[in-house]
Amino acid sequence: MKKPIEFYLSGDRVYSTREKAINQLYNNRGYGELKGDKLFLSLIEAAYLTEKGWIKVVDKDKELKFDDLMKLGKSRDEDFDIKYIVYKDLRDRGYIVKSALKFGSHYRVYRKDAEHSDWLIWVLRENQRLSPNDITARARVAHGVRKNMVLAIVDEDGDVVYYKVEWIKF
């Protein structure tokens, strides 16, 4: 994209009514959620696309840069930074990444052009504890909706390691 598409901050999301945004970002690349004639992006999507130079975010006539969006996201979610690292890693690998809040996870991940997601991703810091009950519950939900449960562990250097968790019945 040559000229960044303008988006406007609205609460914990950004939106655009521009047809170019809908065609290039939503229809062609799977970003955001379309509601009527508006394309809404999460703050993580907005930060990613701002960092790539594809969009610019405006709040009250002031442009929000990548660092501003990261700071805003971190003020609303203490794990915003690691969720962003995982989001960026998956998007850079060519996957479509959507919220998985309704499945009790952070992300649903789709292969490009796939209608259904293959994975549910739960993002954790390397030193963060997760109880066996948390792991079991997430694996059970993923199995119930025919998806693979994946733990994305982010170390202090910002590197991500993915662990697939399977529900096995004997």
Swiss-Prot record:
Gene3D superfamilies: 3.40.1350.10, tRNA intron endonuclease, N-terminal domain (3.40.1170.20). GO terms for molecular function: lyase activity; nucleic acid binding; tRNA-intron endonuclease activity. PANTHER family: TRNA-SPLICING ENDONUCLEASE SUBUNIT SEN34 (PTHR13070:SF0), TRNA-SPLICING ENDONUCLEASE SUBUNIT SEN34-RELATED (PTHR13070). It comes from the Archaea. Transmembrane segments: none annotated. Belongs to the tRNA-intron endonuclease family. Archaeal short subfamily. SUPFAM superfamilies: tRNA-intron endonuclease catalytic domain-like, tRNA-intron endonuclease N-terminal domain-like. This is tRNA-splicing endonuclease. Keywords: Lyase, tRNA processing. Pfam families: tRNA_int_endo (PF01974), tRNA_int_endo_N (PF02778). Endonuclease that removes tRNA introns. Cleaves pre-tRNA at the 5'- and 3'-splice sites to release the intron. The products are an intron and two tRNA half-molecules bearing 2',3' cyclic phosphate and 5'-OH termini. Recognizes a pseudosymmetric substrate in which 2 bulged loops of 3 bases are separated by a stem of 4 bp. The keyword Lyase applies. The active site is at Y110, H116, K147. It catalyses: pretRNA = a 3'-half-tRNA molecule with a 5'-OH end + a 5'-half-tRNA molecule with a 2',3'-cyclic phosphate end + an intron with a 2',3'-cyclic phosphate and a 5'-hydroxyl terminus. The keyword ATP-binding does not apply. GO terms for biological process: tRNA-type intron splice site recognition and cleavage. Its EC number is 4.6.1.16. Homotetramer; although the tetramer contains four active sites, only two participate in the cleavage. Therefore, it should be considered as a dimer of dimers. HAMAP family: EndA_short.
